[in-house]
Every structure is written in C-alpha cells, then in structure tokens.
C-alpha cells in the first residue's frame, strides 16, 4: 500500500489496533456505481453513522471527488461535522428534526432537511420565521409507501406537498420514499412500493406542482432495478464495497473498503487442559501456542463471536479461542510456532489469498453486515490508505 492518510493524532504504526480505509477501493466503487446509472441520475453517498464506521469526513471527501453529487447523513451533528471539515456539497439530513435548535443549526450550516409530516413542516416554517431567516431552506418531502417509519402516507401526498409549497421559508428540493425489501429476491413488496410512489407523484402533478427531483432507490434497489433510479439514488453499503444481497453480486464490481487490524502483544505456550479467558469456555485439548491480540469488544469485535471467528496472520487463517474480552482476544497460534509479538493480525480484510468479510461476521452473528460495520468504535483510529 503506497501511502497513509493519518486520521488520528497518533502515528498509524504505533497503534494497538486500527481501521484501514482503502480510498482507491472507495473511489472505484463510486465510479462503478456512476457508470451503472444514466448520466441524468445523481448519486448521493450516504455517510451517516460515521460513514458506516469508515470515517465520515475522509469518506465524504473521497466519494465527492469520485463523482458523488451530494451526501446523506442521519443527524444534524453529522452534517455539521462535514461542514466544519470544509465540505460544501449538498448534505441531506435523512432523520427527523423538530426542535428549534436543530432547525436553527440546519439554517446556519446550510444543510437540507427531511420533512415527513404536516406538523413538522409547520414547525420548520414557524421557527424560521421566528429567527428571521432570510433564504428558504431546501427540504425533501418524505412519503411512507410501505416502510412504516418516517413520512406521510403516500395517499395524502398531494395535499401534503401542496401545504409545504405554500409555507414560507421552505423550498421543496425533492420528494422521496424508502424501500423496505429491496434486498429480497422476491420483488413483490418493492414493486408495490414503486406503484404507490408513482401514484403519489401523479397526485402531485395533478395539482400542477413541479418537483425538482425524485429519489427512491437505496443500494439494493439501485442494483436491482434501473426503473427505480429516478433523478438520484441514495447509496450506502455499496459505496463501502459490500453487496446488499447475494443475488445482486453479478450486477457490478465492488471492492471492500475496510480492513481491521491489530497487533500480537504476547505469545506463550499452554499445557493440555489449560483454560483460556473468562469462564474457561475453551480448554486446550493439547499443548498449544497461544497469542494475545490487542483488540476486543470495546473496539467493536462482538463478544458473541467468541470461539466462532478466525483471524488472518501471514496470509493464514487462525482460530480465535476463549471468550473475547473488553480489550483483547486470544488465538491459537500453534500453526505459527515462530510468531512474534508486534506482528499484525487482520480481523476483517485480506491477507494473501485469504479474506474475511463483514458478511462472514454477520452470518456467524445472525445479523447484517450494516450492523457489523457500524460497530467499530472511535478508539480505533481510521487510517486512509492510497
């Protein structure tokens, strides 16, 4: 790897554990996605939750340079963080915002808001009137077409958009919705949500209201059906090089971006019958070489992976043994008798011909790769690698 972009106050090589972000892979993914879209369709890079654990500022800057048009975050502080880093691209707050403090911050930092109900629209307009904000705030109208989360029911789309259009201080930038089952091989529910979205847009057009932009597709829908691309797609997981579902893997070539690394801090020989870690969940069946790795569940390695996971050392798979502790975990290093303290262990990522992915962890944990990625804590420095 040619160079490192430091994302923490300490030198990357001095760390007990860290997360490497492959910025070339990230750029590749954005460019591949852009090529998959029509020239008229914009790409929003979703960088909420610290860019799914990858580091929001570095990811946002790289994604924009690679061709993303705008950014999506969940909260106002996430948007402010990007503005403070000097990012000028449009930033949409995908989550709910209601308080005067949130609305004032959106205005101050030139963010864009999701409006999901008439009540919220009125609160926004009244608050902006109170603070005497001069220019209108771009807002994105959220419709509920089947997710049963944020948004006004699609059947009331016309009257809802008409209300927002008439309110002072609000400028409608788009109408959008979110799909609940786009990653399913069965497209039935997605098709129904698509139909509802189309009917909602027809309602709005009947009233003579022009909407600058429409967006519906997440990563899965972007890969599954070009009819859902509209004017913009909101892509999160695919930007980070993961596929939302196995049946979508042949649609586009993506490269995983994240690599989680830690160091060997101690190596010892243990006798047969020796218990390892809390609760002695693992008992050595024979004499073994044991190595301690400087990463644990406080860093984002789930304790439920205890005795279920492997790590990579020198391009080989090595089993983890015993209960994963807060700051450390143990591995069976018997296959590497000359293993030395200070050597690097890969928990997620690639070494040689072997690789371990977030999907592997998700399968072992009976969860989803999104949760795995978002679990890596801030005490792991993010290091951008070119």
Curated annotation (Swiss-Prot):
Keywords: Isomerase, Pyridoxal phosphate. It comes from the Bacteria. Its EC number is 5.1.1.1. PROSITE patterns: ALANINE_RACEMASE. Substrate binds at residues 149, 326. GO terms for molecular function: alanine racemase activity; pyridoxal phosphate binding. Catalyzes the interconversion of L-alanine and D-alanine. May also act on other amino acids. This is Alanine racemase. The gene is alr. The modification N6-(pyridoxal phosphate)lysine is found at residue 48. Gene3D superfamilies: Alanine racemase, Lyase, Ornithine Decarboxylase, Chain A, domain 1. GO terms for cellular component: cytosol.
């Amino acid at each position: 790897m040619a160079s490192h972009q430091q994302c923490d106050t300490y030198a990357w090589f001095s760390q007990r554990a860290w997360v490497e972000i492959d910025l070339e892979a990230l750029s590749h993914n954005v460019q591949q996605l852009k090529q998959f879209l029509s020239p008229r369709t914009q790409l929003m890079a979703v960088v909420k939750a610290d860019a799914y654990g990858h580091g929001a500022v570095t990811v946002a800057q790289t994604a924009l340079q690679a061709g993303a048009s705008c950014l999506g975050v969940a909260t106002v502080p996430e948007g402010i963080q990007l503005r403070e880093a000097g990012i000028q691209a449009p930033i949409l707050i995908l989550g709910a915002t209601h308080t005067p403090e949130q609305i004032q911050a959106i205005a101050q930092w030139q963010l864009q808001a999701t409006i999901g109900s008439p009540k919220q629209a009125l609160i926004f307009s009244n608050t902006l009137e109170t603070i005497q904000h001069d220019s209108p705030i771009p807002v994105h109208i959220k419709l509920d077409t089947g997710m049963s989360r944020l948004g006004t029911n699609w059947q009331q789309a016309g009257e809802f958009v008409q209300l927002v259009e008439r309110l002072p201080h609000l400028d409608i930038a788009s109408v959008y919705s979110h799909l609940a089952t786009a990653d399913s091989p069965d497209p039935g529910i997605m098709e129904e949500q698509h139909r509802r979205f189309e009917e909602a847009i027809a309602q709005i057009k009947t009233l003579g209201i022009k909407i600058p932009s429409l967006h519906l597709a997440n990563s899965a829908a972007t890969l599954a059906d070009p009819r859902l691309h509209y004017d913009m797609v909101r892509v999160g997981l695919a930007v980070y090089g993961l596929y939302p579902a196995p049946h979508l893997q042949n649609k586009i070539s993506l490269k995983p971006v994240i690599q989680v690394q830690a160091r060997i801090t101690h190596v010892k020989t243990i006798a047969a019958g020796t218990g390892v870690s809390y609760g002695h969940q693992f008992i050595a069946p024979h004499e073994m070489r044991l190595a301690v790795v400087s990463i644990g569940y406080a860093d984002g390695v789930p304790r439920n992976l205890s005795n279920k996971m492997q790590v990579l050392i020198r391009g080989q798979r090595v089993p983890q043994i015993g209960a994963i502790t807060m700051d450390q975990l143990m591995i069976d290093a018997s296959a590497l008798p000359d293993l030395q303290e200070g050597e690097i262990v890969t928990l997620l990522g690639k070494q040689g011909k072997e690789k371990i992915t977030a999907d592997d962890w998700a399968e072992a944990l009976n969860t989803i790769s999104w949760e795995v990625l978002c679990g890596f804590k801030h005490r792991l420095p993010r290091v951008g690698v070119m």
